[in-house]
Design a protein with these regions (language model features):
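Glycoside hydrolase catalytic-domain context in secreted enzymes
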Residues: 1-188
Length: 188
């Protein structure tokens, strides 16, 4: 039987070098070149020890080759987390977050995020860079539409609904992805 995840993480961290820990904090971008003939070149660019990839192409061969490299060529075989900016849908496109907030229907947003999670997971995505919870204080800011507006309470209600939709009750479920609240304080 496998050790509980906390013990596995503690064990890995105790064996990692400083360089390996730093590489785990790195995130590469790949997959914007949709030419399947370049998959080998794309894979060569990615260090086996990195923690995550922004995964734009969602090509299963590319994903599998990069993951194989991480598992077989890194010293500890730590898998890569594949992330995608699915801020208002993945294959099915929904209104932007500001439009979602205008619905005053967080349950609907939760359902949309659950569908987004299912579609993203089927394409090999583990993690979305959503929801954006910056409170819009200045309408001139170019990313106002990615958030839920100017009211902190509304932002919180819709962000919570989004996270429930993406992650559900069981993060190990095959139709769920990790959510990532963004950005740092003061960005919006």
């Amino acid at each position: 039987a496998e050790a509980p995840i906390e013990k596995r993480v503690d064990d890995l961290l105790s064996r990692m070098t400083l360089e390996e820990k730093i590489l785990q904090l790195n995130q590469y971008t790949m997959g914007r070149n949709n030419n399947v003939n370049n998959i080998g070149e794309e894979v060569k660019k990615v260090p086996a020890e990195i923690g995550s990839l922004i995964y734009y192409d969602t090509n299963p061969t590319l994903r599998n080759n990069v993951q194989k490299k991480a598992m077989e060529e890194s010293r500890l075989g730590i898998p890569i987390i594949f992330g995608y900016d699915a801020i208002h849908g993945f294959r099915t496109v929904y209104p932007i977050s500001l439009g979602q907030a205008c619905s005053w229907n967080p349950e609907l947003v939760e359902k949309a995020c659950a569908v987004t999670a299912q579609e993203a997971r089927m394409s090999g995505v583990d993690w979305t860079f959503s929801p954006m919870i910056d409170v819009a204080r200045d309408p001139r800011w170019g990313r106002v539409a990615e958030g839920y507006g100017e009211d902190p309470y509304t932002n919180g209600v819709f962000a919570a609904a989004s996270v429930r939709g993406y992650q559900g009750d069981d993060m190990s479920a095959e139709d769920r992805i990790a959510a990532c609240l963004k950005h740092y304080i003061g960005y919006g």
